[in-house]
Regions:
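Short, small-residue-biased leader/transition segments that mark boundaries at the very start
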Residues: 1-5
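Extracytoplasmic cell-surface/polysaccharide-interacting catalytic and binding patches
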Residues: 6-214
């Protein structure tokens, strides 16, 4: 069972809502901007997915071509990109989370303690960006688990520098943990070309971008 080791904290900061002259003209209720988080549970959401080229993983059918193009660009740059995780349905996420809770309780944790600890490793069901079908963990090779200390930093820099060219952003950047609760520099999220360029230029996470339209 593959698991991502995540830095997770209680979110306290509010998204940036200052005004921008170059704000893209988009329908913020569209599928590209769906947020899955503790504040936005998407338990009933089931996207149509297609297989990613060269992988057993799947991705939202409307964005899979963009992901394939990003992966090709990585290969052309000399990397061997590996999809660690892409679409993960609710029931799979629920099983991973409950397995982690049970493991923690066997070690002596109370249910509350076990759930708190489990959330650092596996997002509670309905709160994972992977359920949107628009998020993928991309690394440079297979790892038994993901952490900022083990994944190739040079590849993560390449990913951050190039993903917007294909409509993606880093979903959980290190400088937005106070808003997102996570630090996952390998986790790309499809938001479309215009949003990706804008978010990258202005250093915004998805929560901050969506808040600009509220």
């Amino acid at each position: 069972r593959q698991m991502c080791i995540r830095d997770s904290i209680q979110t306290t900061a509010q998204p940036d809502t200052k005004k921008y002259d170059d704000l893209p003209d988009v329908d913020i209720s569209s599928w590209e901007y769906l947020i899955a988080s503790q504040a936005h549970n998407i338990s009933d959401y089931v996207p149509d997915v297609s297989k990613i080229s060269g992988s057993q993983s799947t991705f939202d059918s409307r964005a899979v071509d963009a992901l394939n193009a990003l992966l090709k660009a990585a290969r052309d740059a000399g990397w061997s990109p590996y999809i660690y995780c892409a679409y993960r349905p609710y029931l799979t996420q629920e099983q991973q989370y409950e397995d982690q809770v049970s493991e923690n309780m066997r070690k002596g944790d109370t249910r509350d303690e076990a759930e708190t600890a489990a959330a650092r490793v596996a997002a509670p069901p309905g709160t994972s960006d992977h359920q949107t079908g628009l998020g993928a963990d991309i690394v440079d090779q297979y790892y038994s688990s993901l952490s900022v200390d083990t994944v190739n930093a040079r590849f993560l820099t390449w990913l951050a520098d190039n993903c917007a060219d294909y409509g993606f952003v880093i979903r959980y950047p290190s400088d937005k943990v106070s808003i997102t609760g996570r630090n996952e520099p390998w986790h790309v999220r499809y938001v479309g070309d215009a949003a990706a360029r804008f978010m990258t230029e202005h250093n915004l996470c998805l929560e901050e971008f969506v808040a600009l339209y509220q």
